[in-house]
Design a protein with these regions (language model features):
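Extended amphipathic coiled-coil helices
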Residues: 7-10, 14-174
Length: 174
């Protein structure tokens, strides 16, 4: 019986022959090089009409949504140039093109609110000049401008901006 087993083992070895296993390891390195833009030089060329319509459709929160699309788009890391690192203190971080600066949080929120409103207004004017008519969208933005005159609404908008700047801080690569 032992002889039979030896013979079976030898036959199996002959059938399988020399089996060589080649294991290949491949490592792909992808380097994405980009230059972080200064907060005042943020690039908005990637925004489409659809992006603007989407933001304005959020009525009172159109500005926080626009901030997300501009400053926290994973595909536009060069615009990751502003954030709030600690919700409890009164500062925000802004990049000026060379270095990060601690900035008064309320000042930067007022700044960013006004700046993004101007961007939307310019887009609406551009649409009118080109003959594109989005009456519902224009009406929504006009309503937003009227509602934001009330301090309660304005405070909610500013709070939402603060949350956007804080909640997306992890996208920023210092």
């Amino acid at each position: 019986q032992l002889e039979d087993q030896k013979q079976q083992i030898n036959e199996l070895i002959k059938k399988t022959g020399n089996t060589t296993t080649n294991i290949t390891y491949q490592q792909n390195n992808v380097n994405n090089n980009f230059k972080l833009l200064g907060y005042r030089n943020t690039d908005i060329s990637h925004l489409s009409d659809k992006d603007f319509i989407s933001c304005i459709s959020h009525s009172n929160f159109c500005i926080p949504h626009l901030i997300k699309k501009i400053h926290f788009d994973p595909d536009k890391p060069e615009n990751h140039n502003i954030y709030i690192s600690n919700i409890k203190n009164n500062y925000a971080m802004t990049y000026d093109g060379d270095k990060w600066n601690l900035t008064n949080r309320d000042d930067i929120i007022n700044d960013i609110l006004e700046e993004k409103e101007i961007i939307i207004e310019e887009k609406l004017e551009e649409w009118l000049e080109k003959g594109k008519k989005y009456p519902e969208i224009m009406k929504k933005f006009t309503r937003y401008l009227e509602k934001k005159e009330h301090d309660v609404v304005l405070d909610k908008i500013k709070d939402e901006i603060k949350l956007v700047l804080f909640n997306n801080r992890n996208l920023i690569k210092n």
